[in-house]
Amino acid sequence: MESSVQNKPIIELRSITKSYGDKTIIENFNLTINNGEFLTILGPSGCGKTTVLRLLAGLEELDSGNIILDGEDITHVPAEQRHVNTVFQSYALFPHMTIFENVAFGLRMQKVPNEEIKPRVLEALRMVQLEEYAYSKPAQLSGGQQQRIAIARAVVNKPKVLLLDESLSALDYKLRKQMQNELKALQRKLGITFIFVTHDQEEALTMSDRIIVLRKGHIQQDGSPREIYEEPKNLFVAKFIGEINIFNATVLTRVDEKRVRANVEGRVCDIYTNLDVVAEQKLKVLLRPEDILIEELDENQSSKAIIGHVADRNYKGMTLESNITLDHNGMTVLVSEFFNEDDPNIDHSLGQKVALTWHEGWEVVLSDEE
């Protein structure tokens, strides 16, 4: 029974369009969000992600289309009457009020009886582990604590959906990492649908059940973090999510249903793809830095692999990154290897000749969009 409730759509955006003047930001946009889901809308600045959030919150009016919340059409329902709350990047806490009064503010505006307010506020503060700061002022709290207070204020009204607009971007790196874990744990505890807007790919991959990648108001890919990272649907998604190497390939022939023989940066090899291809067709072969295997060669040693030379090395703690310049065309390839101080073969010298390969089937093959 619980599973069916969780899979029930809580929000449906049906063919929504929004323009500012003569500039269309979102056009014929459709999206279904399930109950209890942590969904991230990810994209570069100007892609329309914040516009979608503001439309959901009722802070902007649609030009056309419909917004359905839990089966009810709320397209023309004012923001204050929607069961949706928003946590903004600035947190917007009232500096002259105590933390208790900040969290209680929305309840008082809704004329909730006084005897209900105190237990609800304290429960919300307990959820974010800040009950002991109830009678402090916002200025006495750290940035991370203020962020949690903003969340407590948003959830005390028991919304059906919580919207978060780049709400971790003001925090320093270490605190942001900590808050990513806390926010996801809180979402699981509350069971409320979270819709998080960010341009930070790492945040999206860390916290989300599902990611929507947006570009110029259009969905480029909709999937789990793993699908988005390991199986990008186009070059935009591939380039936007993490580091990736993009090799040029030319089709030679199809070997079987799964494999195509191709020339990949001077190396003839079999690549896995179900694309309908013809001889001489141009393709792109995509590989994450951690998926590439590197082998040192003597300078006069030949190999059927892609050949290059080590141009730079960067120690990253858990990993060692190598920039490899390909002999074939001077292209730079990024290779990431897990650091093992007992492995004598991992710390390659600058100028070292190397062979690059990968495990069959780990590559992503896309049509050449250029």
From Swiss-Prot:
Subcellular localization: Cell inner membrane
Q: Is Protein transport one of the keywords UniProt gives this record?
A: no
- Family label: Belongs to the ABC transporter superfamily. Spermidine/putrescine importer (TC 3.A.1.11.1) family.
- InterPro entries from the xrefs? AAA+_ATPase, ABC_SmlMolc_Importer, ABC_transporter-like_ATP-bd, ABC_transporter-like_CS, Mo/tungstate-bd_C_term_dom, P-loop_NTPase, PotA-like, PotA_ATP-bd
Domain annotation ABC transporter: ranges? 11-241
- Sites binding ATP sit at G43, P44, S45, G46, C47, G48, K49, T50
Membrane topology recorded in Swiss-Prot or TrEMBL: Peripheral membrane protein
- EC number(s) on record? 7.6.2.11
Q: Does the keyword Cytoplasm apply?
A: no
**What superkingdom does the record give?**
Bacteria
Encoding gene (name):
potA
- Tell me, what does this protein do in biology? Part of the ABC transporter complex PotABCD involved in spermidine/putrescine import. Responsible for energy coupling to the transport system.
GO MF terms listed in the record are:
ABC-type putrescine transporter activity; ATP binding; ATP hydrolysis activity
Gene Ontology CC annotation, any one? ATP-binding cassette (ABC) transporter complex
The protein's name: Spermidine/putrescine import ATP-binding protein PotA
Spell out the reaction equation it catalyses: ATP + H2O + polyamine-[polyamine-binding protein]Side 1 = ADP + phosphate + polyamineSide 2 + [polyamine-binding protein]Side 1
Which proteins does it associate with, and in what oligomeric form? The complex is composed of two ATP-binding proteins (PotA), two transmembrane proteins (PotB and PotC) and a solute-binding protein (PotD).
Keywords from the named record: ATP-binding, Cell inner membrane, Cell membrane, Membrane, Nucleotide-binding, Translocase, Transport
Which Pfam families has this protein been placed in? Answer: ABC_tran (PF00005), TOBE_2 (PF08402)
Q: What class of enzyme is it?
A: translocase
